[in-house]
Regions:
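Bacterial N-terminal signal peptides
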Residues: 10-20
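Extracytoplasmic
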Residues: 561, 571-577, 581-725
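Acidic/polar, glycine-enriched structural segments that form the non-catalytic walls/loops
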Residues: 25-118, 194, 198-201, 205-212, ...
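Aromatic-rich carbohydrate-recognition surfaces in CAZymes
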Residues: 118-226, 252-260, 365-378, 384-392, ...
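Recognizes extended acidic, P/S/T-rich segments that occur
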Residues: 552-574
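Pro/Thr/Ser/Gly-rich low-complexity, intrinsically disordered linker/stalk tracts
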Residues: 519-552, 586-602
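Non-catalytic carbohydrate-binding regions of carbohydrate-active enzymes
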Residues: 271, 275-301, 333-482
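Extended glycan-interaction surfaces of carbohydrate-active proteins
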Residues: 70-119, 143-172, 215-250, 285-367, ...
Length: 725
């Protein structure tokens, strides 16, 4: 029989009886259990060092593991063992997915993404490893990363080595462009020379390719979808469900911070004549200039529009945490972000505000891996209340569900809430790899302070420390080859425990802690849950010489990405692109669809198109097309073209356009050119590059562009050009 404390016996009996007698337990995490909104969990330690977790879903026996913690909290120690057990289950000899090799196993000593996701996905793997999995099985991590990098199979498309952007919105890259997260995760594994050589080759080639196809030199930002938040209408306006062109031409905080991190890595590793350090510095400045909102004290999740990017009153914790951890946000902004981004008793939402009309998945949810990045950000900002909040949220979620789950509903921290069509989380996998990485990061870095560079810098909130130390004088992390021992201070008068002195003896590092008082960042608990619903496209009436825009109650008009006070717009030849939001309860909705007013020249046919521009100066090109080579939500066959404009007496200008998968005829992303003088111009479309060109996508069998061969195609019906202000 396992050895169980008397209090644990009572709790385990109550759980077995349905939990009725435990209703009086306070919500939260204790040393040996957790309770929240009537659900409870308890853990007991057996004589052999193994654990038994009892929770509403049953019991789970957890074997002893290679890495061990010794604290006064059986829950803390047992959940660390559970994370390692989950990692072992995610360590496989073969991977599979219905969309690849017809669902047949593909040999790979790899990590799978989770119980319900038995494949290797670029961003999931990369964030998981970056959070700490690289320490536990580095060779398996390298194998997994190697599966997500590829050469080129398309003749004439070069011989580069590129990171794969997984199947995704509108046909993948360059609509989604966060594949550079691969470098953030894989940077921890470069002690292997062969792996490091391929890493450097892929780094140089991928950054060069993204500079051509995703970088907007005028704004200084990279285009593309938010990292991780890739279920379009969950976080973008609902009208992007069937047309992702807006997403393709928009700019996301998280994706730009990941590019910043990749450029910083390149600056430290590559010596090929490119000024990566200068590019990184310029990108950091552009992020701070374009995404920061002083009125909110946070960076926006994304910005976008047809002429100039409009602000969107929406925020996501992954992007914010990455900005803090990477140094894009200085210490003052880091503290403002943590003070202004709201939390709920169960944890921190991945987006805010939530969408009233969307089911629970990214919307209205807690994702443990995002909470782990929030924990890392809180440590960078010396914010003990936030450090403790994230740690307790991660422990509570794992304990109450008996595994490191993919996600939780925000208010209840349940793995399913029944709300009819809004029920969710829509998908929720046990032993989700990045949730496993999150818990391991919580222990190794979040509590014991072991940083990626192997420095040890614990920052323990006093309230949490009392649970972990109890009557013990020290707590220990034992990796099998290294021991970290944290010694309790004589007093805990402050709010944060940090290093006082240290001693290294062989493989053991002793850290004596001291209590200090830092200026804490309070948890924001007063935020409204939902954003206002976004309005329909604006109604515009031609008044003869001017256009009148009808606003709904609470409506706010934007013209070319800027708030406009007047709703009557004098006719102009140059573009006036209008959208509307709703302000309510101090929040602003997402934008309506946009309507553009102005003089349009229509150019019929497939091109090339020769025309005489009506104005000199900036001009916008859009192409009318159909691309039904895959569904809107996935695939690898976004059509990509390099649009070239040659005007009389002027140099050739080249810009990239993207023609995403769609369900009807639609328009491409815009290309912006400068007309130097009046005269004839010719626009032609040249071949580009998409993910179907990568050799590794020969495994893809769900749709076109995979096993059937590379495909970068769309039916072009014509183009339009409009002068810009």
């Amino acid at each position: 029989m396992p050895t169980v404390r008397p209090t644990m016996i009572h709790l385990a009996m109550a759980l077995a009886l349905g939990g009725a007698s435990c209703a009086a337990l306070a919500d939260g995490v204790t040393r040996d259990g957790a309770a929240f909104q009537g659900r409870q969990a308890s853990i007991s330690t057996n004589a052999d060092g193994s654990f038994r977790l009892a929770y509403d879903g049953g019991t789970r026996d957890i074997a002893t593991q290679p890495w061990k913690t010794t604290t006064a909290s059986p829950l803390f120690d047992g959940l660390f063992a559970m994370a390692q057990a989950d990692l072992a289950a995610d360590s496989v000899k073969a991977i599979s997915d219905p969309g690849f090799d017809h669902g047949q196993p593909i040999a790979c000593d790899c990590f799978v993404t989770g119980e319900k996701w038995p494949f290797v996905w670029t961003r999931d793997l990369s964030f998981s490893v970056d959070l700490g999995l690289w320490r536990f099985d580095p060779q398996r991590a390298r194998n997994s990363f190697a599966f997500k990098v590829s050469g080129v199979r398309q003749p004439g498309a070069g011989d580069g080595t590129y990171v794969m952007q997984d199947t995704g919105s509108g046909g993948s890259w360059p609509i989604s462009t966060d594949r550079v997260v691969w470098f953030v995760g894989a940077q921890h594994l470069l002690s292997d020379r062969a792996f490091a050589a391929r890493y450097d080759k892929a780094l140089a080639d991928t950054l060069a390719q993204d500079r051509v196809y995703a970088f907007d030199s005028r704004l200084g930002l990279y285009r593309g979808e938010t990292s991780f938040l890739d279920w379009r209408e969950q976080t973008y306006p609902a009208w992007t469900k069937e047309d992702v062109t807006f997403i393709a031409q928009s700019f996301a905080l998280s994706t730009n911070v990941l590019h910043y991190q990749a450029l910083r890595i390149a600056a430290s590793r590559l010596h090929d004549g490119n000024d990566y350090a200068g590019q990184a510095a310029a990108l950091k400045a552009a992020i701070n200039r374009r995404f920061w909102r002083d009125d909110r004290g946070m960076y926006m999740s994304y910005i976008g529009g047809d002429v100039e990017p409009a602000p969107f009153d929406t925020y996501d914790m992954l992007g914010l945490a990455l900005a803090i951890d990477s140094g894009v946000a200085d210490q003052a902004r880091a503290k403002k972000i943590l003070a202004n981004y709201p939390v709920w008793p169960a944890g921190t939402p991945v987006i805010w505000p939530e969408r009233r009309d969307q089911p629970i998945y990214h919307n209205r949810s807690i994702w443990p891996f995002v909470s782990a990045y929030a924990l890392r950000a809180a440590r960078r900002a010396d914010a003990p209340a936030h450090i403790e909040h994230e740690i307790r949220s991660l422990m509570q979620g794992a304990a109450l569900s008996g595994s490191n789950m993919e996600n939780f509903e925000l208010v209840s921290q349940k793995i399913h809430v029944d709300e009819g069509p809004l029920s969710g989380p829509v998908v929720d996998s046990p032993r989700q790899l990045w949730s496993v990485g999150a818990y391991m990061g919580l222990v190794v870095e979040g509590v014991f302070g072991l940083e990626p560079d192997d420095t040890i810098a614990p920052k323990l909130p006093v309230g949490l420390a009392r649970d972990l130390f109890g009557d013990k004088e020290s707590i220990t992390l034992d990796t099998g080859t290294r021991r970290i021992v944290l010694h309790k201070p004589n007093g805990m008068e402050g709010n944060l425990l940090v290093t006082d002195r240290r001693k290294i003896s062989g493989s053991t590092t002793d850290i004596w802690l001291k209590a200090t008082t830092v200026t804490d960042v309070p948890l924001r608990k007063d935020a409204p849950l939902y954003a206002p619903d976004a309005p329909d496209a604006p109604e515009v009436t031609d008044k003869g010489g001017s256009d009148s825009v009808l606003l709904p109650p609470g409506g706010v008009l934007y013209v070319n990405g800027v708030r406009a006070k007047a709703t009557t717009l004098p006719h102009r030849d140059t573009a006036q692109c209008v959208s509307v939001t709703i302000e309510e309860r101090g929040l602003e909705s997402l934008h309506s669809p946009t309507r553009c007013l102005g003089t349009v020249q229509t150019l019929p046919g497939e091109g090339p198109w020769t025309f005489t521009p009506s104005h000199k100066g900036p001009l916008q090109l859009r192409v009318s097309y159909e691309n039904d080579n895959g569904p809107v939500n996935t695939g690898v066959t976004a059509a990509v073209r390099r649009a070239q404009m040659q005007c009389e007496g002027a140099a050739v200008q080249t810009e990239v356009i993207v023609m995403a998968h769609g369900i009807r005829r639609q328009v491409s992303t815009p290309a912006r050119f400068d007309v130097p003088a009046h005269g004839s111009c010719t626009i032609s479309l040249k071949p580009g590059f998409n993910m179907s060109y990568l050799a590794q996508f020969a495994h893809y069998t769900q749709a076109k562009g995979g096993a059937s061969g590379p495909l970068d195609a769309a039916r072009v019906f014509g183009a339009s050009v409009m002068p810009l202000p």
